[in-house]
Protein backbone atom coordinates (compact mmCIF):
# COMPACT_ATOMS: atom_id res chain seq x y z
CA UNK A 1 0.00 0.00 0.00
CA UNK A 2 2.88 2.37 0.70
CA UNK A 3 4.09 2.02 -2.88
CA UNK A 4 0.61 2.81 -4.19
CA UNK A 5 0.43 5.86 -1.92
CA UNK A 6 3.83 7.08 -3.17
CA UNK A 7 2.71 6.59 -6.78
CA UNK A 8 -0.49 8.54 -6.18
CA UNK A 9 1.34 11.35 -4.37
CA UNK A 10 3.94 11.62 -7.15
CA UNK A 11 1.60 11.26 -10.12
CA UNK A 12 -1.45 13.14 -8.82
CA UNK A 13 -0.36 15.47 -6.01
CA UNK A 14 -3.25 17.91 -6.52
CA UNK A 15 -6.98 17.33 -6.41
CA UNK A 16 -7.56 19.11 -9.73
CA UNK A 17 -9.33 17.06 -12.40
CA UNK A 18 -9.16 19.79 -15.05
CA UNK A 19 -5.41 20.20 -14.55
CA UNK A 20 -4.78 16.50 -15.18
CA UNK A 21 -7.26 16.28 -18.05
CA UNK A 22 -5.44 19.15 -19.79
CA UNK A 23 -2.01 17.64 -19.09
CA UNK A 24 -3.12 14.27 -20.47
CA UNK A 25 -4.60 15.89 -23.57
CA UNK A 26 -1.38 17.84 -24.13
CA UNK A 27 0.71 14.70 -23.68
CA UNK A 28 -1.41 12.71 -26.15
CA UNK A 29 -1.15 15.57 -28.65
CA UNK A 30 2.66 15.53 -28.25
CA UNK A 31 2.75 11.77 -28.73
CA UNK A 32 0.46 11.75 -31.75
CA UNK A 33 2.25 14.68 -33.40
CA UNK A 34 5.49 12.68 -33.67
CA UNK A 35 4.29 11.56 -37.09
CA UNK A 36 2.62 13.99 -39.46
CA UNK A 37 0.19 12.68 -42.07
CA UNK A 38 -0.38 14.86 -45.10
CA UNK A 39 -3.66 13.96 -46.74
CA UNK A 40 -6.77 15.76 -47.87
CA UNK A 41 -8.81 12.74 -46.76
CA UNK A 42 -9.78 13.30 -43.13
CA UNK A 43 -10.93 9.68 -42.75
CA UNK A 44 -7.40 8.50 -43.59
CA UNK A 45 -5.99 10.79 -40.91
CA UNK A 46 -8.51 9.56 -38.34
CA UNK A 47 -7.68 5.94 -39.18
CA UNK A 48 -3.93 6.55 -38.99
CA UNK A 49 -3.96 8.46 -35.71
CA UNK A 50 -6.36 5.97 -34.15
CA UNK A 51 -3.96 3.17 -35.08
CA UNK A 52 -1.00 5.20 -33.77
CA UNK A 53 -2.85 5.73 -30.49
CA UNK A 54 -3.57 2.00 -30.26
CA UNK A 55 0.14 1.26 -30.78
CA UNK A 56 0.90 3.27 -27.64
CA UNK A 57 -1.46 1.48 -25.25
CA UNK A 58 1.00 -1.33 -24.50
CA UNK A 59 3.57 -2.23 -23.31
CA UNK A 60 2.70 -0.67 -19.99
CA UNK A 61 4.85 0.86 -17.27
CA UNK A 62 5.27 -1.76 -14.58
CA UNK A 63 7.62 -0.09 -12.10
CA UNK A 64 6.55 2.27 -9.36
CA UNK A 65 7.67 5.91 -9.35
CA UNK A 66 10.61 4.88 -7.14
CA UNK A 67 11.63 2.16 -9.62
CA UNK A 68 10.38 -0.81 -7.58
CA UNK A 69 8.64 -3.69 -9.35
CA UNK A 70 7.65 -7.30 -8.69
CA UNK A 71 9.77 -9.63 -10.81
CA UNK A 72 9.01 -13.02 -12.35
CA UNK A 73 10.99 -14.57 -9.49
CA UNK A 74 8.33 -13.19 -7.11
CA UNK A 75 10.80 -10.74 -5.56
CA UNK A 76 10.81 -6.95 -5.40
CA UNK A 77 13.46 -5.44 -7.70
CA UNK A 78 14.67 -1.91 -8.29
CA UNK A 79 15.40 -0.14 -11.55
CA UNK A 80 18.27 2.30 -11.70
CA UNK A 81 17.48 5.19 -14.03
CA UNK A 82 15.13 3.28 -16.33
CA UNK A 83 11.45 2.32 -16.41
CA UNK A 84 10.38 -1.33 -16.24
CA UNK A 85 7.70 -2.36 -18.74
CA UNK A 86 5.32 -5.30 -18.94
CA UNK A 87 2.40 -6.45 -21.10
CA UNK A 88 4.66 -7.63 -23.91
CA UNK A 89 2.59 -9.39 -26.53
CA UNK A 90 5.76 -9.93 -28.53
CA UNK A 91 4.20 -12.40 -30.95
CA UNK A 92 1.97 -9.56 -32.10
CA UNK A 93 4.29 -6.57 -31.76
CA UNK A 94 7.85 -7.52 -32.76
CA UNK A 95 7.25 -6.93 -36.50
CA UNK A 96 5.74 -3.45 -36.45
CA UNK A 97 5.12 -1.87 -33.04
CA UNK A 98 8.63 -2.29 -31.65
CA UNK A 99 10.35 -1.05 -34.83
CA UNK A 100 7.96 1.93 -34.70
CA UNK A 101 9.02 2.61 -31.09
CA UNK A 102 12.67 2.77 -32.19
CA UNK A 103 11.76 5.83 -34.28
CA UNK A 104 9.05 7.49 -32.20
CA UNK A 105 10.21 6.62 -28.67
CA UNK A 106 13.84 5.44 -28.60
CA UNK A 107 14.19 6.02 -24.83
CA UNK A 108 11.15 3.86 -24.23
CA UNK A 109 12.51 1.21 -26.64
CA UNK A 110 15.75 1.18 -24.62
CA UNK A 111 13.82 0.70 -21.39
CA UNK A 112 11.86 -2.14 -22.96
CA UNK A 113 15.10 -3.94 -23.85
CA UNK A 114 16.33 -3.35 -20.31
CA UNK A 115 13.04 -4.82 -19.08
CA UNK A 116 13.68 -7.92 -21.22
CA UNK A 117 17.18 -8.28 -19.80
CA UNK A 118 15.97 -7.84 -16.21
CA UNK A 119 13.33 -10.51 -16.90
CA UNK A 120 16.10 -12.79 -18.19
CA UNK A 121 18.25 -12.20 -15.10
CA UNK A 122 15.31 -12.98 -12.80
CA UNK A 123 13.74 -15.82 -14.80
CA UNK A 124 16.53 -17.42 -16.82
CA UNK A 125 15.04 -16.57 -20.20
CA UNK A 126 13.71 -13.68 -22.23
CA UNK A 127 9.98 -12.99 -22.08
CA UNK A 128 7.56 -14.55 -24.54
CA UNK A 129 4.31 -12.93 -23.35
CA UNK A 130 5.12 -11.13 -20.11
CA UNK A 131 2.06 -9.90 -18.26
CA UNK A 132 2.57 -7.88 -15.07
CA UNK A 133 5.70 -9.64 -13.94
CA UNK A 134 4.72 -13.16 -14.94
CA UNK A 135 5.35 -15.19 -18.05
CA UNK A 136 2.13 -16.48 -19.60
CA UNK A 137 3.77 -18.63 -22.31
CA UNK A 138 0.74 -17.90 -24.47
CA UNK A 139 2.73 -17.91 -27.69
CA UNK A 140 5.71 -19.72 -29.11
CA UNK A 141 9.01 -18.35 -30.33
CA UNK A 142 11.67 -15.93 -29.20
CA UNK A 143 10.28 -12.62 -30.38
CA UNK A 144 12.22 -10.58 -27.83
CA UNK A 145 15.36 -11.42 -29.83
CA UNK A 146 14.52 -9.39 -32.99
CA UNK A 147 13.38 -6.49 -30.79
CA UNK A 148 16.75 -6.48 -29.00
CA UNK A 149 18.71 -6.87 -32.25
CA UNK A 150 16.74 -4.08 -33.97
CA UNK A 151 17.46 -1.66 -31.13
CA UNK A 152 21.12 -2.66 -31.06
CA UNK A 153 21.61 -2.29 -34.83
CA UNK A 154 19.96 1.14 -34.73
CA UNK A 155 22.32 2.24 -31.95
CA UNK A 156 19.50 2.71 -29.49
CA UNK A 157 20.05 2.54 -25.81
CA UNK A 158 22.63 1.94 -23.20
CA UNK A 159 21.84 -1.67 -22.45
CA UNK A 160 24.67 -4.19 -22.15
CA UNK A 161 25.08 -5.86 -25.59
CA UNK A 162 27.06 -8.77 -24.11
CA UNK A 163 24.28 -9.45 -21.61
CA UNK A 164 21.76 -9.15 -24.45
CA UNK A 165 23.63 -11.73 -26.55
CA UNK A 166 23.91 -14.03 -23.53
CA UNK A 167 20.15 -13.73 -22.94
CA UNK A 168 19.33 -14.42 -26.60
CA UNK A 169 21.55 -17.52 -26.76
CA UNK A 170 20.40 -18.87 -23.38
CA UNK A 171 16.76 -18.43 -24.33
CA UNK A 172 17.26 -20.15 -27.69
CA UNK A 173 18.82 -23.14 -25.90
CA UNK A 174 16.04 -23.73 -23.40
CA UNK A 175 14.51 -27.20 -23.36
CA UNK A 176 10.92 -26.38 -24.27
CA UNK A 177 9.70 -29.66 -22.78
CA UNK A 178 10.34 -28.08 -19.37
CA UNK A 179 7.88 -25.26 -20.05
CA UNK A 180 4.34 -26.10 -19.04
CA UNK A 181 1.82 -24.37 -21.26
Regions found by a protein language model. Give the residues of each.
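Extended acidic/polar, glycine-enriched regions
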Residues: 1-39
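Conserved small/polar residues in nucleotide/adenosyl-binding loops
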Residues: 179-181
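Conserved oxyanion/phosphate-binding beta-strand-loop segments in alpha/beta enzyme cores
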Residues: 38-84
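Second-shell loop/turn segments in exported
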Residues: 12-13, 35-40, 84-86, 97-102, ...
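Structural helix-adjacent loops and short alpha-helical linkers that scaffold large soluble proteins
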Residues: 39-44, 61-67, 103-113, 153-166
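Active-site-surrounding "flap" and adjacent substrate/cofactor-binding loops of secreted or lumenal enzymes
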Residues: 18, 66-80, 106-131
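Secondary-structure capping and boundary motifs in well-ordered enzyme cores
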Residues: 43-44, 83-92, 137-144
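Alpha-helical support elements that line or immediately flank enzyme active sites
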Residues: 48-63, 86-109, 149-154
